[in-house]
């Protein structure tokens, strides 16, 4: 919590790395995964622009892989509340869209959390969202329409408009989900839109891998900055050559001056002239 509080005052140049390290520490030392979810949501609210996809993907993976207890229901309810304000960071919308599409049914019986309410809360962000987020929302809408009868008349016009979207991913998803209901039986559609299976649990989390990659990128950047460029090396070589040429000219001029100033050499010149 102290690190999260310090993040507000941290320099923008180090925030991304700080967010990544806080996320790793929160996962590593979490005694309660609900606290871990809350910590990541704090990171999103404080410094959402610096929360990478790897961080929120990891939240989704952990929540999906822990069906026991109330973690999935807790996360769905918490994210629905987090996405309720109209001004909400887009990363929070992405996480909420995915989690509600998978586990929103666990809280649909609670006051203010029905399937229709879930759709309305998510869809208020549609206009301000990037295409990547809209693609996630389209998949969530398909799942909500499959689970809740009251969502179908709300989702249908959205999909109809999306079929003409300039974004290929949004256009394709909406067209496929619309055609799915017409081409398959309700049982087949339900089977196709059921919640995702658990993710493969790798020994090294994607967050730790991302941190190592970032540290490697930073080291490479420092080394590159310290190493002179080809143009700099060429200029240095030209400067050295010019310096050597100037030194040679100066040495030659000094030698000639010494000859003129040497008395013995001057008398030799007069003697030689007398012989002729």
Model-assigned labels for residue ranges:
Residues 15, 22, 33, 52-53, ...:
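Residue-level detector of extended alpha-helical repeat arrays and alpha-solenoid scaffolds
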Residues 48-51, 67-72, 86-95, 106-114, ...:
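A glycine-rich, aromatic-flanked flexible loop/lid motif
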Residues 10, 32, 71, 166, ...:
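Catalytic cores of large soluble enzymes that bind and process phosphate-bearing ligands
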Residues 106-136, 140-276:
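Acidic, serine/threonine-rich low-complexity intrinsically disordered linkers/hinges in large eukaryotic
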Residues 20-24, 95-102, 138-146:
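Contiguous, well-ordered alpha-helical segments that form the cores/surfaces of helical PPI scaffolds
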């Amino acid at each position: 919590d102290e690190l999260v509080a310090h993040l507000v005052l941290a320099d923008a140049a180090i925030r991304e790395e700080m967010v990544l390290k806080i996320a790793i520490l929160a996962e590593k030392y979490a005694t309660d995964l609900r606290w871990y979810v809350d910590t990541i949501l704090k990171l999103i609210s404080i410094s959402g622009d610096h929360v990478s996809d790897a961080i929120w993907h990891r939240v989704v993976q952990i929540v999906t892989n822990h069906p026991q207890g109330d973690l999935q229901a807790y996360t769905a309810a918490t994210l629905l509340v987090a996405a309720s304000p109209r001004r909400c960071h887009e990363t929070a919308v992405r996480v909420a869209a995915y989690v509600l599409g998978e586990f929103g049914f666990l809280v649909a019986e609670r006051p203010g959390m029905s399937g229709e309410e879930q759709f309305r809360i998510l869809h208020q962000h549609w206009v301000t969202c990037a295409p990547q987020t809209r693609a996630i929302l389209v998949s969530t809408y398909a799942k909500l329409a499959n689970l809740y009868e009251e969502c179908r008349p709300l989702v249908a016009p959205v999909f109809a408009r999306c079929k003409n979207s300039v974004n290929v991913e949004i256009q394709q998803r909406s067209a496929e989900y619309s055609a799915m209901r017409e081409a398959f039986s309700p049982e087949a559609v339900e089977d196709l839109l059921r919640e995702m299976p658990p993710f493969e649990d790798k020994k090294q989390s994607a967050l730790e891998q991302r941190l190592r990659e970032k540290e490697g990128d930073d080291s490479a950047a420092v080394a590159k900055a310290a190493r002179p460029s080809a143009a700099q090396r060429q200029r240095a070589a030209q400067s050295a050559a010019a310096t050597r040429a100037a030194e040679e000219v100066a040495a030659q001029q000094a030698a000639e001056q010494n000859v003129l100033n040497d008395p013995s050499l001057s008398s030799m010149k007069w003697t030689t002239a007398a012989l002729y």
